[in-house]
């Protein structure tokens, strides 16, 4: 693909708007169509961002011959339905995280994409951020020795009332899939899939997690991760990686960082940044990095991204399932 990458945006919520804003900064890519469950919402979104076509149903977007790739921005309870619809219509897909409600749904999407030879990627923007990529290079080059611990947290306060989507089991509510996916993905970026999962949580009257603490373990690596997520507590939203020869600290906002600090015995602290990194800068939020990776992969004829591999997304979903099993959270879609 050597022409402009033509995007369709499926859903019109806040993250879809951020996506459309950031895409304006990416040369060689443009949003050409948007879809919502209502034509009114789709048209309002199209007018806001200068998008030529607006659809009041998802199927019309999936059938649009002028769309190369669809960004699925629905709540995660609809990710499987929306992404499968687009894949079945022959569209490449970038799907928001959490990838799906459970690992079974994720496996179905991955199989569908692989069977059809289509590109599919979870929108884990953290993995595409140049600062995070710089960190992983340092860790893999042995800058802090063997990783022994990872600590990360992502908590916010609403308040989120009983009618909010984050409190609705049918919509995959709770802290884990909305926020916990970040610290879990961060730990697994460095250590892969854990072989031990422990968790404890505070549950809402509706049966979703308001706050979850996780302890993940990797027997062969001799490593562990202490992770927290919450929709009732404003946590620091920091991360730290400790190895046998040093430590890396991320300031608040570790999931879209502008910098990190490397600490090693006998050395002054070293601060690392990366060109064009972080969410700030020209009003961008940081989604341009995942957008650029999708465009690069499509132009290269790749059906999976090496930065956000599908096997990695499946492994994260298995961990999230294991955490929900430990804390007793089930969704209607689990069956």
Per-region residue spans from a language model:
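Contiguous beta-strand/loop segments that form the cofactor/metal-binding neighborhood of enzyme cores
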Residues: 1, 185-257, 286, 294-300
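Rossmann-fold dehydrogenase core element
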Residues: 108-126, 146-149
